From Swiss-Prot:
GO molecular function list: ATP binding; glutaminyl-tRNA synthase (glutamine-hydrolyzing) activity
Function, as annotated: Allows the formation of correctly charged Gln-tRNA(Gln) through the transamidation of misacylated Glu-tRNA(Gln) in organisms which lack glutaminyl-tRNA synthetase. The reaction takes place in the presence of glutamine and ATP through an activated gamma-phospho-Glu-tRNA(Gln).
InterPro entries for this protein: Amidase, Amidase_CS, Amidase_dom, AS_sf, GatA
Reaction catalysed by this enzyme: L-glutamyl-tRNA(Gln) + L-glutamine + ATP + H2O = L-glutaminyl-tRNA(Gln) + L-glutamate + ADP + phosphate + H(+)
Key word Disulfide bond present: no
Record keywords, A-Z: ATP-binding, Ligase, Nucleotide-binding, Protein biosynthesis
Active site: K76, S151, S175
Name the UniProt record assigns to this protein: Glutamyl-tRNA(Gln) amidotransferase subunit A
Recorded superkingdom: Bacteria
Amino acid sequence: MHQLTLAEIARGLADKSFSSEELTGALLARIKQLDPQINSFISVTEDLALGQARAADARRAAGETSALLGAPIAHKDLFCTNGVRTSCGSKMLDNFKAPYDATVVAKLAEAGMVTLGKTNMDEFAMGSANESSHYGAVKNPWNLEHVPGGSSGGSAAAVAARLLPATTGTDTGGSIRQPAALTNLTGLKPTYGRVSRWGMIAYASSLDQGGPLARTAEDCALLLQGMAGFDAKDSTSIEEPVPDYSASLNASLQGLRIGLPKEYFGAGLDPRIADLVQASVKELEKLGAVVKEISLPNMQHAIPAYYVIAPAEASSNLSRFDGVRFGYRCEEPKDLTDLYKRSRGEGFGVEVQRRIMVGTYALSAGYYDAYYVKAQQIRRLIKNDFMAAFNDVDLILGPTTPNPAWKLGAKSSDPVAAYLEDVYTITANLAGLPGLSMPAGFVDGLPVGVQLLAPYFQEGRLLNVAHRYQQVTDWHTRAPNGF
């Protein structure tokens, strides 16, 4: 059963080939057997899962037919889950049990999904390798000496290892799309405001967005259907109707205009990845798409702008973790200042401390205009580039990452080298656009992804193109050895 996709599970549950309880038991056993190799879970919620599975079976027996009813899910460990540890991969929240469900968790639970656990992640979602977690690095199932990407590395590795068919992740600068690319998955970052952020512990509030990770575009469509929608509890949620994503999966690509930004194919891109991107373009042309070169001139400024804005927002968001109300508290502080300093110094890891310091500096008197305001101006220019491009094309296509997965520890001493791996993904977050990564081949036995970007709220178009591509290629069907 572990080889089944989410869509196949939905069909199997509907025709009573197996029950949710049987499926849940099989996957929990598989997690117990195989996860020690990859460390993709922080918490496994066995009792909760079996209870939810029995309830889902009862709902189905009573006549309910929802596609997600009884299907398994695991949540990135920054989605608050009532009564379950929600750690953000940090010592700071090691003992924090959320007193409520995040909207994403609640919506999927209402749809009948079964929560198998909480997945490992870079601490407070700050990282591109899933090496900064308090609970240890996650390993890439395709090669256990390599990173799975981050920050949703646990969510990606768990699906790649066939521990379950789908997971939730979050994407602040590529944290769904990049690990999806490095583990041979389909990962979708929705439009900013499409999926509620309520109960999703924030890294950078103007950039964070939750979304699905799965093996196929068909599965991402099913999961997004359950996650998306307006939420009055989230002030950044947008009241936009949610279309039937699955219904548009088989639309024709005839005449679809796809733009290839010339800036994506310069220095820094592994030429073998460039070749795989071109191969995917040829497949889409065979399906009727029309491809042309475009320009996104301000992309060159994206990384410096992002690494001012995101740390600035993080320094503000993480100021609440001070050892007073909840979270880690140091032992026997001398006074209040000592409590703050030691609780934060001992509770936060190195990468989180680095970004808090960068962000605090960027927001400080005398530097605010020089750094933060300037970064926001660049953000506007990047958004304008996309708006101009979408006057001429329907989608933008390029590599998801400049390189395949690197070895564990290879970039630990040079954080900027790791930051550069986000070069193709962060622009979508700065502009708030939807983006999708889909499997496109392998380099040295390691997976590579192709990224698609669309105008606001055109997730259906992204899923349609990815689904049609997956009907004529088999990259997404390949599984790592030993899993």
